[in-house]
Amino acid sequence: MHRRAFNAAFIEAGLDWYWDYRTYKKLLRTTGGKERIRAFARSRFPRVCLSDSVVIALHQRKTRHYGRLIAQHTCRLRPGIASLIRNARARGQALAIATTTTSSNIDDLLSVALDQNWRSLFTAVVAGDDVERKKPAPDVYLEVLARLKQRASDCLAIEDSANGLKAAIAAGIPALINRSEYFRDDDFSGALAVVDDLTEFGLIPAAGGNHLEEMRFEKVCPDRND
């Protein structure tokens, strides 16, 4: 959906840019939409430096197209996410979002995938436009920890990319990887576990505890040969 929104923004801006699957997969190594625009421009026009105003305007077009596309299509959570949210809330565990995307994008997405009151499910929501540095820098996670008033070792991050994993580890937070299409080939060394979807694992509290050290992972499906 993001790739389609970028391409729609390029057309609207009168640019002959087009990001196909392979191009976008490569660009995802750079975190942040505005940063990807700059990276692509540098690779295609190395002697041209886009001004901040041009990059911001182009990214704003992309954000509008993303919101439109999300509203037009059925957007579902990844398998296991809904039950994870439900079970965590039932146990009284705090949930937070630490993302490199913008606040606007996350609102567009979760308003459709959950509902308009999605923010009530999360104790903290930190987006890429809330911090100075994006992943793989740990800034979003450090801000989440500050808002939650929790120790990093008491938390668990769920990520899908090497950059996200690096950010969590740099913040001292153990991480579980839920693989996604664009990042399947990333190096996930250092993750607690790597799964294709979250229905493969259950997070089972021991003795009713709420902290990570009082929990264990329980495999709920056979091992797969990756």
Where in the sequence are the language-model features?
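Extended hydrophobic secondary-structure segments that form protein cores and membrane-embedded regions
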Residues: 24-25, 56-59, 124-128
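Short beta->alpha linker loops
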Residues: 1, 32, 53, 76-80, ...
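Short, surface-exposed alpha-helical segments at coil->helix boundaries
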Residues: 3-4, 34, 103, 107
